[in-house]
A protein has these predicted regions:
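Glycine-rich, acidic and aromatic/proline-enriched surface loops and short helix-turn segments
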Residues: 52, 128-129, 162-165, 194-195
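Non-heme Fe(II)/2-oxoglutarate
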Residues: 2-111, 233, 255-256
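Catalytic core of Fe(II)/2-oxoglutarate
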Residues: 155, 166-256
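Short, solvent-exposed loop/turn and secondary-structure capping segments
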Residues: 58-62, 135, 224-227
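Short, conserved beta-strand element in jelly-roll/cupin
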Residues: 123-126, 142-168, 218
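Short beta-strand segments enriched in hydrophobic/aromatic residues
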Residues: 38, 50, 138, 163, ...
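Non-heme Fe(II) oxygenase catalytic core, chiefly the N-lobe of the double-stranded beta-helix
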Residues: 51, 95-147
């Protein structure tokens, strides 16, 4: 039962990206899995909250100047709890996810040679019958508007924490890279957000899938490879935690 729907579009105030589409190429090696990233306590706490939550956001669809839908709110109705909602419900959830962000930032920055800032957290439920067609996170990828920004052009990198696996279907797939897999509970995943990395989710056929999606805005590229068309300069450089836990990275491999 849905007890409440909170109207909110919790978008970041950022309006662009310094990282052009295609900057990270199209290799499958840019799609990374970190197994057992969450502790058992973190995973259990977040899953218990998500699976018992009955309060979800209400958002508004948006179109660009050509009339193309760049955000379809109907797809996410009664399925998403973003920062504003989570803060009203349980601040410990927000604090726990931010702690995960802090740990993961070290690995993301190191892997892509960037200084990146995480967007606000959200929890998404995927009940039976839901699915997601292939899409890019920061831009449109089909039709006459392909390559134009969607409603989130600052989503340079995608991040995902998975909370459970007691469902059928719900596999994450990348058509361009030829891979499809069921994400592991407690794991973290990240990959570029442009149209070289379009991805989708197969239909949930039983159970409910719970995910924490978020994104990274790249504030700075930290090695010799620099984008040609920088748009923004940033002052809020984040400090790395020298005491972070070492995580072994494992790129997702193509299925033979």
């Amino acid at each position: 039962m849905i007890e409440e729907r909170i109207p909110t579009n919790n978008y970041e105030s950022v309006q662009g990206s310094i990282t052009p589409s295609g900057f990270f190429g199209n290799s499958v090696d840019m799609i990374v899995e970190l197994e057992n990233f969450m502790t058992e306590e973190e995973q259990e706490f977040l899953f218990n909250f998500a699976s018992n939550n009955t309060t979800w956001d209400y958002t508004i669809s948006k179109k660009n100047e050509n009339g193309t839908v760049i955000y379809d709110a109907d797809i996410w109705a009664d399925r998403v709890a973003t920062l504003h909602t989570l803060q009203k419900l349980n601040q410990k959830v927000v604090d726990t996810v931010h702690g995960l962000f802090d740990r993961l930032k070290i690995e993301v920055d190191k892997f892509y040679n960037v200084n990146a800032k995480a967007t606000s957290p959200a929890i998404v439920r995927w009940p039976v019958g839901t699915r997601q067609e292939p899409h890019a996170d920061k831009e449109l990828h089909t039709g006459p508007d392909a390559g134009k920004p969607n409603d989130f052009p600052w989503y340079d990198l995608a991040g995902l924490f998975y909370l459970n696996d007691d469902y059928e279907g719900g596999e994450l797939y990348f058509p361009n890279q030829g891979i499809q897999f069921k994400p592991k509970p407690g794991a973290a995943y990240f990959f570029p957000g442009d149209m070289n990395y379009v991805h989708g989710v197969t239909e949930i056929t039983s159970g409910i899938r719970y995910v924490i999606p978020f994104f990274w805005t790249i504030l700075k590229h930290t090695n010799d490879k620099q984008p040609d068309n920088g748009v923004y300069k940033w002052d809020n450089v984040l400090v790395e935690d020298p005491n972070h836990i070492h995580i072994v990275m494992k790129p997702i491999k193509r299925k033979e």
